Every structure is written in structure tokens, then in C-alpha cells.
Design a protein with these regions (language model features):
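Glycine-rich phosphate-binding loops of nucleotide-dependent enzymes
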Residues: 2-284
Length: 284
């Protein structure tokens, strides 16, 4: 995986997933907190090797949905399935072991560690050498570390940050640190990426570069991506499918162009509400 970072994001082609990447199925997902309904019977399917955007106004339930997908929250009812595996109620570390990686909105790189060492942390679940062997620097441990570092360098080149591997992560510009976060997630060798506002706070150039990398992850690696993002330009360029939430309910689902013109979506973003009862507002 040593391809150079693409300059522009492709226009959402149909891309088959890698053979071992299953579909993610969310079925009738409901989450309640002390009587407040954060998600109300939400369903959608992420096809293998596609970018599926989850959008909606603030308070729509997007972050709650992400927290259920990654195991941080437990659903009140409903199911999340990754292929044949039931993720509902599974703890975060077990979900990660199935190849699900999440990137949070806030930066989480160790600021004083080098970028290379920060990325190496993403290889932790793939490490077979025990603490004793690593501490004694046995030949098997040294060989495994070399293999992991080679992989880290390949991924850094793919993402476009190989020039910064020897620098402290905290010294990088904000956009570069966000790319390093993405590279660290890729170091886990995921089959599904959960990206929570990956271009938030970036300059226009940084947004374009990051969108190009995300497109490359889908097109070159066949990894499925669930994307929460407020930048509708990025969503429309990247997403193969879009699910729209509003007050915890799914109000639209389909191709980006169709969803963009859906009257219910337009009303939600303009602040106009239909007359039927709605669920309670919670954190987005």
C-alpha cells in the first residue's frame, strides 16, 4: 500500500469492496436516555467498500449513532451487524478487534511522540510478541517491530505524511495531525472506518487533500467508511449513499443527489418542521 496521495477526490464511482469486507447493517436502532429518545428505530446499510455519510442538523443523533456503532453506548433496542457478527452490546475493544476503527473529532495523538511512533500505536492489536520478548529485545521481537515499522512507513506514504515521520506529532499543523490520525487508524488494518467530522476546522486546501485521501482509502483499499460531516461539499463529493437524521429519526436515505433535493431534508436544514410529532432533541 504505497500509492501516492491523490490530488483530487473522485466523483463517487461504484467501487466493489475487498473480499473480506462485509456489509454493516443497522436495524431499528433505538437509544433512550432517562426517557429522552436519541435514536428512534433508525435503519441503514453500508455496502462493502463504499462511503456512507450520516448527516443531519445539530441534535439529530449522529454522534449517538456513532457511539453505538463503536460500542461506547449500548442500544436500548435494535441491532448492529457487521457481516455475520452482532455488534450490539459488544465492548469497544472487541469491535476494534473485528476491524472497526474510529477517528474522533478531537486530536488524540501523543504530542511529544514522533509521528512514526504514534502511528505504530495503531499496530498494537496486530502485535504478537509479548512484553517479555519485547523487553529483552529477542530476535523475534526485533523482526516483528521492523515489519510493523515498514508497514507504518507504507501507510504514511499513502496518506502523504511520510516527510513528517521523525517529527513530534504535536509540531504538525492541524490538518497534518488529522491526516496522521487517519494514518494511525489505517495502521490497524481496518475493514470499516468511522470518521467523525474528519475535515472540521481545516482550511479549504486541507479539506481537499483530506477528502482525496478518504476517496483513496475507499477506491484503492476497498475499506468501508461511515462519515459524519457538516461540510456538505465534502459529503456530496465523497458519499456513495447518504442517511439523514433529524431529531433521532431517519428522514431520508439514498444517493447524494436524491437526498439533497428531498423536501424533508430541505425543511430540516432550513429549520422548518412538519406538523407530525417528533422525537426529543439530544446531542448530535
Amino acid at each position: 500500500m504505497s500509492a501516492a496521495m491523490p490530488n483530487t477526490a473522485p466523483e463517487t464511482p461504484e467501487t466493489p469492496g475487498a473480499p473480506d469486507v462485509p456489509a454493516l447493517q443497522v436495524e431499528d436502532l433505538t437509544v433512550r436516555f432517562a426517557g429522552l429518545t436519541a435514536l428512534d428505530s433508525v435503519s441503514f446499510t453500508v455496502r462493502p467498500g463504499t462511503v456512507h455519510a450520516l448527516i443531519g442538523p445539530n441534535g439529530a443523533g449522529k454522534s449517538t449513532c456513532f457511539n453505538v456503532l463503536s460500542g461506547v453506548y449500548r442500544a436500548t433496542s435494535g441491532h448492529v451487524r457487521f457481516g455475520e457478527r452482532e455488534l450490539t452490546g459488544m465492548p469497544p475493544h472487541r469491535i476494534a478487534d473485528l476491524g472497526v476503527a474510529r477517528i474522533f473529532q478531537n486530536l488524540a495523538l501523543p504530542p511529544l511522540a514522533t509521528v512514526e511512533d504514534s502511528l505504530l500505536l495503531g499496530r498494537h492489536r496486530l502485535t504478537r510478541t509479548g512484553f517479555v520478548s519485547a523487553g529483552l529485545r529477542l530476535p523475534s521481537a526485533a523482526r516483528e517491530e521492523r515489519t510493523h515499522r515498514e508497514r507504518v512507513r507504507e501507510i504514511a506514504e499513502f496518506v502523504g505524511i511520510s516527510a513528517y515521520l521523525d517529527r513530534p506529532a504535536g509540531s504538525l499543523a492541524y490538518g497534518q495531525q488529522k491526516l496522521a490520525e487517519l494514518a494511525r487508524a489505517l495502521c490497524m488494518e481496518p475493514r470499516l472506518l468511522l470518521l467523525d467530522e474528519p475535515v472540521a476546522g481545516m482550511t479549504a486546501d486541507e479539506r481537499r487533500r483530506t477528502a482525496a485521501v478518504i476517496a483513496g482509502v475507499r477506491d484503492s483499499l476497498g475499506i468501508s467508511i461511515v462519515l459524519v460531516e457538516h461540510d456538505m461539499g465534502v459529503v456530496m463529493r465523497l458519499a456513495d449513499a447518504v442517511t439523514v437524521l433529524d431529531f433521532g429519526r431517519r428522514i431520508a436515505d439514498g444517493a447524494p443527489a436524491d437526498v439533497q433535493n428531498d423536501p424533508a431534508v430541505v425543511r430540516a436544514y432550513l429549520g422548518e418542521r412538519p406538523d407530525e410529532p417528533r422525537g426529543e432533541e439530544t446531542a448530535s
